[in-house]
């Protein structure tokens, strides 16, 4: 995995003004309208008008309220909680745009739900991440723009063009501005080593550590061991998402017991389900850094939380796709 170099700081980025280009339209699903509004602002647009409602039986209805015939349409809809409703709404939006004769439809997925079901771990299971890709493609989308997919193989689940962008620039920029000094980048499990290593390289090749969780014998509790030196250092735990926060919270406690000075949590997607808020706000972490790919309502926020915006990054990617320019050059 290769992470991009840092983008220009937000204060130095000039919004792309496309108001005069009537071919580009952006619409927001209900999953994260705040992010869609910020992306539209970067592009010098306003999200297109649409009607969305639910019938008494739970069925969804969507109608585009302006002509999009011949337009390049971008639909911003992370498939986050409620996952099934968000996914179904995206499919309906795609179908509505296709039937309205849009020239090209791009699904902008800041967060890709079902991403962890990317392989079979037991017999008679579904590979749901692939199924979701099939559904999105079958609905009529032409292209997908996704951010920080859980695993690289998901890109191959789509038989249409997919542009993969990263939330790491905004996280790295924040950490660099903190000037934390003696840092160690930590993967909370063995599976995330490549992500943590790429993150460390962008921080002047900071040292790397791994929290390895294993059972010493059958029927014994799992034991966490730290591979690497964390004593006296500021530990930064890096992952793609924080869901229940069980693994990352236990990893942080192990790091502190091993002598880490303080621990930061760093992830693109703030899923924050179950007991996540209690675990993240109990004083174990100095700060918890996430982005706004998934909305975090006020009642789910806590003093250690920092929510960083990826709207400019997504907006820049949309502009480059629309102009047939390179997206990958953003990350060189």
From Swiss-Prot:
**One of the record's GO cellular component terms:** ribose phosphate diphosphokinase complex
A GO biological process held by the record: 5-phosphoribose 1-diphosphate biosynthetic process
Q: What Pfam families does the record point to?
A: Pribosyl_synth (PF14572), Pribosyltran_N (PF13793)
Q: Which HAMAP family match?
A: RibP_PPkinase_B
Q: Which InterPro entries match?
A: PRib_PP_synth_CS, Pribosyltran_N, PRibTrfase_dom, PRTase-like, Rib-P_diPkinase, Rib-P_diPkinase_bac
Q: What residues bind Mg(2+) 1, as annotated?
A: 150
Q: Which organism is it from?
A: Gloeobacter violaceus (strain ATCC 29082 / PCC 7421)
Protein name (database record): Ribose-phosphate pyrophosphokinase
Any keyword Transferase?
Answer: yes
**Can you tell me which residues the record assigns to a coiled coil?**
none
Q: What is its EC number?
A: 2.7.6.1
Q: Name its co-factor(s).
A: Mg(2+)
Question: What chemistry does it catalyse, as a reaction equation?
Answer: D-ribose 5-phosphate + ATP = 5-phospho-alpha-D-ribose 1-diphosphate + AMP + H(+)
The residues responsible for catalysis, as annotated, are 213
Q: Which GO terms describe its molecular function?
A: ATP binding; kinase activity; magnesium ion binding; ribose phosphate diphosphokinase activity
């Amino acid at each position: 995995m290769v992470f991009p170099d840092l983008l220009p700081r937000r204060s130095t980025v000039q919004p792309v003004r496309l108001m005069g280009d009537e071919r580009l339209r952006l619409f927001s699903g209900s999953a994260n309208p705040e992010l869609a509004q910020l992306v539209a602002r970067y592009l010098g647009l306003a999200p297109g008008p649409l009607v969305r409602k639910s019938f008494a039986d739970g069925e969804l209805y969507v109608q585009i309220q302006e002509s999009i015939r011949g337009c390049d349409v971008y639909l911003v809809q992370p498939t986050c909680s409620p996952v099934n409703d968000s996914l179904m709404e995206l499919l309906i939006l795609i179908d509505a745009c296709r039937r309205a004769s849009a020239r090209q439809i791009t699904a902008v997925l800041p967060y890709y739900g079902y991403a962890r079901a990317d392989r079979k771990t037991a017999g008679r299971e579904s590979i749901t991440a692939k199924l979701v890709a099939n559904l999105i493609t079958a609905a009529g989308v032409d292209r997908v723009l996704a951010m920080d997919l859980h695993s690289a193989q998901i890109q191959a689940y789509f038989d249409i063009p997919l542009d993969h962008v990263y939330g790491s620039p905004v996280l790295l920029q924040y950490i660099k501005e903190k000037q934390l000094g003696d840092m160690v980048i930590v993967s909370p499990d063995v599976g995330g080593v490549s992500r943590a290593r790429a993150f460390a390289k962008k921080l002047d090749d900071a040292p790397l550590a791994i929290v390895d969780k294993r059972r010493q014998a059958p029927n014994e509790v799992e034991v966490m061991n730290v591979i690497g030196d964390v004593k006296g250092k500021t530990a930064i735990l890096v992952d793609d998402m924080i869901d229940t926060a069980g693994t990352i919270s236990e990893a942080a406690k192990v790091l502190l017991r091993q002598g880490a000075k303080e621990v930061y949590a760093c992830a693109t997607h703030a899923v924050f389900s179950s007991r996540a808020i209690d675990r993240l706000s109990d004083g174990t972490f100095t700060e918890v850094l996430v982005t706004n790919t998934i909305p975090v309502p006020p009642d789910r926020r806590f003093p250690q939380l920092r929510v960083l915006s990826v709207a400019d990054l997504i907006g820049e990617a949309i502009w480059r796709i629309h102009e047939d320019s390179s997206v990958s050059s953003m990350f060189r």
